[in-house]
């Protein structure tokens, strides 16, 4: 896992944009026309969805959900992720999955800021090797794995499946794709956006719902004096590259 965090879009609502559009149009119909869903085409979506979202009626986005598989992030990152409570999560269990005593960077996330200091970097790796060794000694001594895991640091890599509706995903990206977000969760956010951008069926919603950091959604940076120098330009350019290709 030396190549960093992997994010993959594994599933999503069938005909997601048609589903969202149909749900929106229900508000205006006198009759419950479920058959109308099958009649909705690309032109209908393009005619209605951008206009309805432009009015701020974003609750309709909740009718489409996306499921992502995230691999290789630390538990520091996953703890931030699960704070977004309008979502579903299933995480790799440290009670049943033993840590494999391989290269420490296959097992733990080490920040780049630490790697820039060679002496400190070696101390980190030494401590992590010792941690793995003691972890193994603990469960080999008969201590249950659910107790042996207590020694593991938050740097340990994990896997997690995340399911969010489009409205919550917009909220998540607004906060976590921001340059002020912690670097690891920010990486996850941009990779999630990249997965949507690669999907022809989903790609239009990026533009219509303004999926991305809050500066993209709002047209200005809401961080005020906390905005990092040059952030506005960097973020907009990155969004165009990732989201629009």
Swiss-Prot record:
PANTHER family reported for this sequence: FLAVIN-DEPENDENT THYMIDYLATE SYNTHASE
Methyltransferase keyword on record: yes
Subunit structure, interactors included: Homotetramer.
Residues where FAD binds: 59, 83-85, 91, 165-167, 171
Matches recorded under CDD domains: ThyX
The keyword Cytoplasm belongs to this UniProt entry's keyword annotation: no
GO biological process: dTMP biosynthetic process; dTTP biosynthetic process; methylation
PROSITE patterns on file: THYX
ThyX domain span: 5-210
Keywords: FAD, Flavoprotein, Methyltransferase, NADP, Nucleotide biosynthesis, Transferase
Active site: 176 (involved in ionization of n3 of dump, leading to its activation)
Pathway the protein acts in: Pyrimidine metabolism; dTTP biosynthesis
Similarity comment text for this entry: Belongs to the thymidylate synthase ThyX family.
EC number: 2.1.1.148
Function comment: Catalyzes the reductive methylation of 2'-deoxyuridine-5'-monophosphate (dUMP) to 2'-deoxythymidine-5'-monophosphate (dTMP) while utilizing 5,10-methylenetetrahydrofolate (mTHF) as the methyl donor, and NADPH and FADH(2) as the reductant.
Binding residues annotated for dUMP, in chain numbering: 80-83, 91-95, 149, 176
Motif (ThyX motif): 83-93
Cofactor(s) listed: FAD
Gene3D superfamilies per the UniProt record, alphabetical: 3.30.1360.170
Catalytic activity: dUMP + (6R)-5,10-methylene-5,6,7,8-tetrahydrofolate + NADPH + H(+) = dTMP + (6S)-5,6,7,8-tetrahydrofolate + NADP(+)
This protein's name: Flavin-dependent thymidylate synthase
One Pfam family linked to the record: Thy1
Protein's organism: Thermococcus onnurineus (strain NA1)
Cofactor: how bound: Binds 4 FAD per tetramer. Each FAD binding site is formed by three monomers.
């Amino acid at each position: 896992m030396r190549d960093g965090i992997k994010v993959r879009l594994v599933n999503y609502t069938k005909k997601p944009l048609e589903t969202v559009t149909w749900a929106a149009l229900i508000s205006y119909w006198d009759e419950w026309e479920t058959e109308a869903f099958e009649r909705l085409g690309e032109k209908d979506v393009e005619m209605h969805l951008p206009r309805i979202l432009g009015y701020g009626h974003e609750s309709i986005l909740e009718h489409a959900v996306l499921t992502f598989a995230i691999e290789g992030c630390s538990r520091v990152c996953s703890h931030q992720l699960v704070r977004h409570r309008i979502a579903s999560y299933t995480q790799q269990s440290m009670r049943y999955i033993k840590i494999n005593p391989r290269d420490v960077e296959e097992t733990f996330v080490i920040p780049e800021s630490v790697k820039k200091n060679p002496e400190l970097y070696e101390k980190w790796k030494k401590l992590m090797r010792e941690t793995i060794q003691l972890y193994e000694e603990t469960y080999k001594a008969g201590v249950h794995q659910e107790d042996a895991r207590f020694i593991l640091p938050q740097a340990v890599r994990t896997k997690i499946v995340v399911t969010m509706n489009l409205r919550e995903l917009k909220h998540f990206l607004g906060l976590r794709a921001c340059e002020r977000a912690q670097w690891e969760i920010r990486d996850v956010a941009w990779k999630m956006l990249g997965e949507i951008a690669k999907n022809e069926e989903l790609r239009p919603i990026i533009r219509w719902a303004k999926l991305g950091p809050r500066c993209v959604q709002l047209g200005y940076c809401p961080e005020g004096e906390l905005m990092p120098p040059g952030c506005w330009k960097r973020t907009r350019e990155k969004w165009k590259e990732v989201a629009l290709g």
